[in-house]
A protein has these predicted regions:
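Protruding loop/beta-arch "assembly-hinge" segments enriched in small, turn-prone residues
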Residues: 1-27, 36-38, 45, 261-297
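Assembly/oligomerization interface modules of large self-assembling protein complexes
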Residues: 14-93, 157, 162, 287
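Generic recognition of stable, solvent-exposed alpha-helical segments in well-folded globular domains
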Residues: 20, 24-28, 108, 112, ...
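Residues immediately flanking
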Residues: 59-60, 97-99, 182, 274-276
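Short helix/loop capping segments that flank catalytic or ligand/cofactor-binding pockets
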Residues: 64-67, 105, 187-190, 281-283
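Alpha-helical scaffold segments that mediate packing/assembly in large oligomeric complexes
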Residues: 92-171, 290-297
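Extended oligomerization regions of viral-like shell subunits
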Residues: 150-266, 270, 276
Length: 297
């Protein structure tokens, strides 16, 4: 009996329109997603051994409350190591392309679509884990800040940045990163102390000596800044990337220039839906704070 193997440089996309993405492709995508995702850069990775759920262990500070699963939190009265249930959820993206790609080899198709797939995945992960936008997860950095009453309302100023830091320092949280956006940089440069010295170093992109990472998302508004100790953001990736290619139907989440949904058959296009399993969890309840416009508080 001849065993058939998948050879990306020979198999056409039209011959394999659904399944698990080839390991070689998955490894490349996950490497580039990890290099760009702020959740993956700032958070703590836990190996899930291919499981949907995994018990991991977290060191507590003996003062704060900690989430041990999606719905249960405990109050600790002494430093200890507690078991935490990390549970993966599905995140999906949809991309569209011309129908001619069905005649590409998988190797050529991957080369052309990889940048879009990578960007779509890391954007989806960060919007879910940091902002709580269209998230399957029970918590996010922004939600944790709101739930802990650690939201400062107002513009990006020296005084408000200090208030943002104080929200965390009052709980003995050591800030190790700010999440901002490039459009905030002019305001950050103008954040000056009483001696008119700026607390933002544009060369190193540090604010008050702490690293700033910039998020690209239309759902993260100008003037918004997240702060916290991101060691309390944990994640794991148990499975490969699965995909399915469709040639018919309408795509309501992606629209034409006139606002109408894309009709795949009529417009001779295809839709690629890719899903990955990822677990993202906030462990410490008071580890994050947010600065946002006063109208949002």
């Amino acid at each position: 009996m001849t065993i058939q193997t998948f050879t990306p440089d020979k198999v056409l996309v039209s011959e394999k329109k659904d399944g698990t993405l080839h390991k070689e492709f998955t490894d490349i995508i996950m490497k580039e997603v990890a290099e760009n995702s702020l959740v993956m850069q700032l958070g703590k990775y836990h190996e899930m051994d291919g499981k949907q759920e995994k018990t991991v262990y977290v060191q507590t500070d003996g003062v704060s409350a900690y989430w041990v699963n999606e719905t249960e939190k405990i109050k600790t009265d002494k430093p200890e190591i507690v078991p935490v249930q990390l549970r993966a959820k599905k995140l999906g993206i949809i991309l569209v392309a011309s129908r001619e790609v069905l005649n590409y080899t998988w190797e050529k198709f991957f080369e052309e679509m990889k940048p879009q797939i990578v960007e779509a995945f890391y954007t989806k992960i960060d919007e879910a884990g940091l902002l709580g936008h269209e998230t399957p997860f029970a918590n996010s950095v922004a939600k944790a800040a709101k739930d802990a009453s650690k939201v400062v309302g107002g513009p990006v100023t020296y005084e408000n940045i200090l208030k943002l830091e104080d929200k965390l320092l009052d709980s003995d949280v050591e800030i190790n990163a700010f999440v901002s956006r490039v459009s905030n940089r002019s305001a950050l440069r103008e954040a000056r102390d009483g001696d008119k010295k700026t607390i933002y170093d544009k060369e190193s992109n540090k604010l008050d000596g702490i690293i700033v990472v910039d998020m690209k998302s239309k759902n993260f508004k100008k003037g918004d800044i997240l702060a916290g100790n991101f060691d309390n953001l944990i994640y794991g990736v148990p499975y490969n990337i699965n995909y399915k290619i469709s040639e018919e139907g309408q795509i309501s989440t992606i629209q034409n220039a006139d606002g109408t949904p894309i009709n795949l058959f009529e417009q001779e296009m295809i839709a690629i839906r890719a899903t990955m399993d990822i677990a993202v969890m906030i462990t410490k309840t008071d580890a994050f704070a947010k600065l946002t416009d006063a109208s949002n508080v």
